Amino acid sequence: ACRWSDHYEAIFVEGRAEYRRRDEEIDSHMEIAVSPEDDVEVRRITLTNLSSRRRNIELTSYAEVVLAPQNSDLAHPAFSNLFVQTEILGDSQAILCTRRARAPGENPPWMFHLMTTQGTPGAEVSYETNRATFIGRARSVANPVAFDLPGPLSNTEGSVLDPIISIRQSVIMDADTSANWHLVTGMAESREAALVLIGRYCDPNFAARAFEMAWSHSQLELHQMHATEADAQLYARLASSMIYANPLHRAAAVILTRNRRGQAGLWAFGISGDLPILLLRIADVHRINLVKHVLQAHAYWRGKGLEVDLIILNEDFSGYRQELQDRILNLIGSGPEVYRIDEPGGIFLRRSEDLTEEDRILLQSVSRVILTDSAESLTQQVTRQAPAIRKVPRFAVTRTPSAVMAPEPVPSRDLLFYNGIGGFTQDGREYVVQIRPGKATPAPWSNVLANDRMGSVVSESGAAYTWVDNAHEFRLTPWNNDPISDPSGEAFYLRDEETGQFWSPTPLPAPGNGTYTCRHGFGYSVFEYTQNGINTEVWTYVAVDSPVKFVVVKVRNQSGRARRLSVTGYWEWVLGQWRHSNLMHIVTEVDPASGTLYARNDYNREFAGKTVFVNVNEAARTVTGNRTEFLGRNGTTARPAAMWQDHLSGRTGASLDPCAALQAPFDLAKGQEREFVFLLGAGNDAEEAHQLVRRFSGSAGAKLALECVWEFWKRTLGTVHAETPDPALNILVNGWLEYQTLACRYWGRSGYYQSGGAYGFRDQLQDTTALLNAAPWTAREHLLRAAARQFIEGDVQHWWHPHTGRGVRTHFSDDFLWLPYCACRYVKATGDTGVLDVQVPFLEGRAVNADEESYYDLPQHSDEEGTLYEHCVRAITRGLRFGSNGLPLIGCGDWNDGMNLVGAKGKGESVWLAFFLYDVLRRFSGLARSRNDVAFADRCTQEAE
């Protein structure tokens, strides 16, 4: 919410939800129902003016448009949003949305949103479908720019980059009067069907009918299930724990910490692990009624669209265990879910005697809710209260905040190509951005800090996300892909321990009242800021040779008096692809000797054993591994609850909302400076993690690591130097282009816009060719890496994930040709012909069918090997396939991925590919001749001519 209310109440009954608020003498009552007749949600809002004066009230709706499966949206939200189109229907006070089709036969759905009112209208209705215009850069839904000034929305429509649906309507309300609105959001299979629904629900009476029908339908469902309203309330309450795992209903922490098996361990039971799991443990045949109620709850959820895997574990080891098994089967067979046995979202009946101890631990660990046939009834188990936890004392103010000191003027800098916000330093080695209060860059201006094992994308706001080994598969902190709000799962804070005032040493998430300076350099970023006489300088960088990220906070007291402060670091754990699918399985602990906070996720089968850590070089610190504690209920990183607490609780372990937070209080004399070194890193196992902490902790380790970063990039980027009449080109060529290629493209394979993590066969071969002068070793290692992703037939994986080898096999016609092309370029640039004789295995896998564009799989390594030269020959041979015009067949695309339909029928040809193949043949003929492979050299020459 944008603000706290004077009064707030939420009411849930069958068929609808209700919310009541009171704000500044305005009562609001919102009711929500889903029509059982149409695919629409209706919100009925009633506002009552309790004041003694006339009020002009604006009502603004807001929702973000997806129109795609969840995984598609999560994988790349900014890309997914590009295909959404919006249309304003002013006559109907509605907005239409759809998604442009991307494949033949695709029939995207249509979405609509409308608003009607019964009251005295004020200004004209206005609309917004562009999220950037509504929210504003570096803002959020809590403080959108659309509310800065009264007036209409912009009425933007069309192919907006980030789609929303928002309608604003105002009414004039006299004292002690009410006004009513209906907000309707719905889906249809076609534009015509959507228009029919819009016309229908523009009628307030029909919108009101949805509430009546929703209640009637819910009562009918309960009657058919032989359930009561009280049963439904109980099942709905239990459903909240199925959606948001509640530690109160999960396994004990001691069980969770013992689990060492991943999702694949469930497959032997026919359970995918993709759906929420409820585990019912029963051993007493006399408690069979508990099974009946749980089966009823499961059917109730399925009727509401909540898919849950229900595991019933027969733990009766007596001679009556078969009787219990039969009774359970009879209950299932007599109910509505008889056809859902061993089906996704269905019922899985298993005997405990058939399970190993590891199996039982796994099933308990993955279950969001565990119910037992203990003395408690289902109602008692669901409504069980959490034991009281000793709360951390509130922060006690010991000094009244004085007037906020005027921000010190930021010294002007003589920057090249200054655009009013930022520019390059005179030597071109840093890009400097100045963020004034209330201002922001047009889009996030980020720096990719990386080595070959770890990376982090850091924006000018201080927002960051970090990964190890693979930017897609093993993220340490969340990748958000939101260039508007620029949210972050990493944050730092300074707090005055006398007044309680706090701020971030970076522009986000909790900005102060002054100007921030961000300096992006080669391998590092720096943030400078002064607040109330406290100057901070934050350096962030990644070690050259280890998976360790540094955030060094230098604090200098320029206030003219002694100060007592604290510095806090915060990280939201992911330890996998997505936070929501991993948070249940993350376990944290603190090493009592070093104070390091460790985290692991053994459920992630590809990275099981990885041990992640954070540390700070200050013995007097408090910690927490509980995000709910740090942020608070409905809290944000802009105003975390921890800033109103005396210290952090020290709580870590399993079954928490996982995070890492370290807080270190300190004293600072007048004119004194102190340095705090925060480490974020990961080891392949606990021992490597311990070694990394010991090696890099403290100022000396941080300083040495930074000097190594400087030296590496100075040496690497100093290889190529150009002097041209164009100073802009000089800056790019003399450092930045090669830096971006190596750090972002080759090592990171990630950026702010896209977080792929995979190697693209053509992509990184091209990247390393660009580095032949600066870093030729990258070209050599990647030629061999890429060759190992070639199938025995000569084609290759279009892209693949390192660590696992899973990837995509396609009909692309150019991928494999980049191998001989880049091999020729490498040998010519370096003279290293020995690489051509290195033996590299091939892959084996099924061929791509003629009627499919690609498939994703884990191919096997073949027993057949060949030298890199032989891999190149096989690639060229594969490319010598021509169409009726004598041009190479394009397959499902050449270098232009957008040409994927040209060769859909196996006949399309590519002019571009003909030029490229010609170049490859001419280059490789010379290479073949130098190796005395005259026959293939002649063939290359003949094919080229």
Q: Which residues fall in each region the model found?
A:
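Eukaryote-specific, cytoplasm-facing alpha-helical/coiled-coil scaffolding segments in long proteins
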Residues: 390-395, 845-853, 902-904
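Anionic coordination/interaction segments
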Residues: 1-765, 776-789, 825-830, 930
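Catalytic cores of carbohydrate-active enzymes
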Residues: 62, 570, 581, 585, ...
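Aromatic-rich carbohydrate-recognition surfaces in CAZymes
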Residues: 301, 493-495, 768-886, 910-918
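Aromatic-lined, polymer-binding surfaces characteristic
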Residues: 273, 719-722, 726-729, 734, ...
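Alpha-helix capping and helix-loop boundary segments enriched in small/acidic/polar residues
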Residues: 32-36, 155, 285-289, 540-544, ...
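Nucleotide-activated donor-dependent transferases that construct or modify glycoconjugates
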Residues: 279-282, 880, 888-891
